[in-house]
Amino acid sequence: MSKMPAKKKSCFQITSVTTAQVATSITEDTESLDDPDESRTEDVSSEIFDVSRATDYGPEEVCERSSSEETLNNVGDAETPGTVSPNLILDGQLAAASAAPANGGGGGVSARSVAGALAQTLAAAAASVSTPGPSSATPSQPPATCSSRFRVIKLDHGSGEPYRRGRWTCMEYYERDSDSSVLTRSGDCIRHSNTLEQTAERDSGLGATGGSVVVVVASMQGAHGLDSGTDSSLTAVSQLPPSEKMSQPTLAQPQSFSVGQPQPPPPVGGAVAPSSASLPPFPGAATGPQPMTAAVQPTQLQGAVAGGALPGPVGQGLPPPPNVNLAQPVALAAQPGPAGGSSLSQQFAYPQPQIPPGHLLPMQPSGQSEYLPPHVALQPPSPAQPLSTSASATSASAASFPLGSGQSVSSLGAQMMGASAQPSEAVAPGPVPVGQAAPCQPAGVAPAALGGVVQPGSGLTGVGQPQPVQPPQQMGGSGQLPAVPGGPHTVVPGVPNVPAAVPVPSVPSVPTTSVTMPNVPAPLGQSQQLSSHTPVSRSSSVIQQVGSPLAQGTHSAPTSLPQSDLSQFQTQTQPLVGQVDDTRRKSEPLPQAPLSLIAESKPVVKPPVADALTNPLQLTPMNSLATSVFSIAIPVDGDEDRNPSTAFYQAFHLNTCQESKSLWDSASGGGVVAIDNKIEQAMDLVKSHLMYAVREEVEVLKEQIKELVERNSLLERENALLKSLSNNDQLSQLPAQQANPGSTSQQQAMIAQPPQPTQPPQQPNVSSA
């Protein structure tokens, strides 16, 4: 851990991230993270969370000094005020509030997610949401700050290894905070968000927030199984989802504002409803949104309401069977509710297929495997949904999104899938169910689920929803959805796909994937997701989630998602996807403003692409829900950092999943490359040393040879000279001389003194030779 801090220290921005976490973990005592962070942490700890958060936010932002961070900074400020005066406007806020209640950290996540959304309003709403979820509002706020920090770090690093390192550092730091804050909830939330954020971070500074939410959800799913132990973790997840919700709302914030306000009353449910409300605006089909809202609200009431009533509805949704039931009712509600009745109905059908997944979900393990089939089945529906449905559904789903009811359509289907991806929770519920599913899963999750979008799937779904929200996009991708279906189940419909993808990977992973699918434009999305929907789902989902929150909040999500997808596809595709997303967003009126944000996100997201590619491998190993969640986060970070982060995760409760994932990351990814490079370097060193040694030996031998040759020539000359000077008698004595060199030499010396000196040495030389 000390190592990690050092690393973090290496990245100044990362340190800032730590501070945010400290604030979050303040409950715990500012664990001494890094000294720099510590000072901040101390301030935060001394101050109330909100205050510390505001203070932290500013300083952190400053430290991180990433343009994105600055934006976040503003957002953070807004967030803090939001905290003071909660703006329930955003469904995200509502979700955040619900999440906060569910989990202290949850709210923070929401805030963070909001920050990721980039929409300052979102941040403000998130802050307010956090406040509404007072119990966890404080913690959640710090997480939000953390997320922004992460984002900032990411942005600062930009693309390239340093960027990765920074992201990693951030992640590790974040995790560290979570650990130190060991607050089960706070810590878990933070950790989850951290994981997500890591991924998001990679994806994009802003993206991180969304991603973190998704990741949390996935984690939640895994935790759901654990429930008792993981409760905190689940809670964190649920919280994250809410934050995601917030993000989603961000886009529609203004739009969904009206919706959001009405929704505020039902915090959790409200959150979902707001989501739907906000989404509807996205869809741009006011009617869609309104009906959606109505439908959503009902659905919300059914399942999302459960969000607020998570416990109660969750009771409903909680039981796997109920989940299924809920999903159906939700789907039904969505169907009737959504303005796009047809699309909703289609989606409804789609969600229903998910319902089975919901059933499966209850058994997360089998649910996942089973999910795929359902997803596949869903996929067809997706195509059935087609874009038209998708579009209509999208708007409806977007509108419904909150509830998941509308979303149920595309999003819902997606959410459902995402929910299903969330194994137990979202799936059964389906979009709305997501909310319900979430309830099913953990109470905390329920809120997220309520967010519906929030659910892991939801986060992803949220992403997907955001896409759905952007009917144009979906429409543009109408072919996309169908095509997606053709692709892996994950790929399938952007939204539906999400669920499918989500379930397949690990729950967490799946959500990611599902998100990815939706976000990814039809072409890229299809190929990317097809090629590596699961892996992509993981990192891309994170990215997408980031984008998704943005997308919903800012429509950035689409771009982000594409990016994440692209990231899987790799940067090459990314640009294209990003462009497509941008175009789509542009086509969509609401999204346009967010588009700029998205554009910013994109670059950030791109760097993560490589990570995403790496992730695919991770995905497989990370099948466990928690693992997938963590894996998402880890993949995002640089390979080098991954290993350390692995150590970190190991230290933490999530450590097992994380560990396996981390190991995986190390094995597949930059880690291997780094090892190879080092081996090569070592070999080169050995070669150079050997070459030097050989050369030296050769030189020495050459010199010796030269000396010997010279001596030989000298002796020959002397011999010739002696022969010429000698007389017959002496020559006749040569044989005797050879026999008796001593005598001969004496004679020679007497005869010719000059040769004498040379000759005696000669003889010894000869003998020696």
Swiss-Prot record:
Region annotated Disordered, chain positions = 20-86, 224-292, 334-353, 520-563, 726-769
Report whether Coiled coil shows up as a keyword of the record.
yes
InterPro entries documented for this protein: TSC22/Bun, TSC22/BUN_CS, TSC22_domain_protein_2
Stored Pfam families? TSC22
Report the PROSITE patterns cross-referenced here: TSC22 (PS01289)
**UniProt feature, compositional bias: Acidic residues:** 28-37
Write down the SUPFAM superfamilies for this protein, in alphabetical order. Answer: Delta-sleep-inducing peptide immunoreactive peptide (SSF58026)
Superkingdom, natural source: Eukaryota
Low complexity composition bias: residue spans: 269-279, 531-541
Q: Where does the entry say this protein is expressed, by tissue? A: Expressed in the cortex, medulla and papilla of the kidney.
Q: Where are the annotated coiled coils located? A: 691-725
Which keywords annotate this record?
Coiled coil
Please list the GO biological process terms of this entry. Answer: negative regulation of cell cycle; regulation of transcription by RNA polymerase II; response to osmotic stress
Residues of the signal peptide: none
Q: Output compositional bias ranges, type Pro residues.
A: 754-763
Compositionally biased residues, Polar residues: 229-252, 542-563, 726-745
Q: Which family does it belong to?
A: Belongs to the TSC-22/Dip/Bun family.
What does the function comment of this entry state? Reduces the level of nuclear PKM isoform M2 which results in repression of cyclin CCND1 transcription and reduced cell growth.
Quaternary context: Interacts with NRBP1. Interacts with PKM isoform M2; the interaction results in reduced nuclear levels of PKM isoform M2, leading to repression of cyclin CCND1 transcription and reduced cell growth. Interacts with WDR77.
Q: Which PANTHER family match?
A: TSC22 DOMAIN FAMILY PROTEIN 2
Please identify the protein, giving its name as recorded. Answer: TSC22 domain family protein 2
What organism does this protein naturally occur in? Mus musculus
Gene for this protein? Answer: Tsc22d2
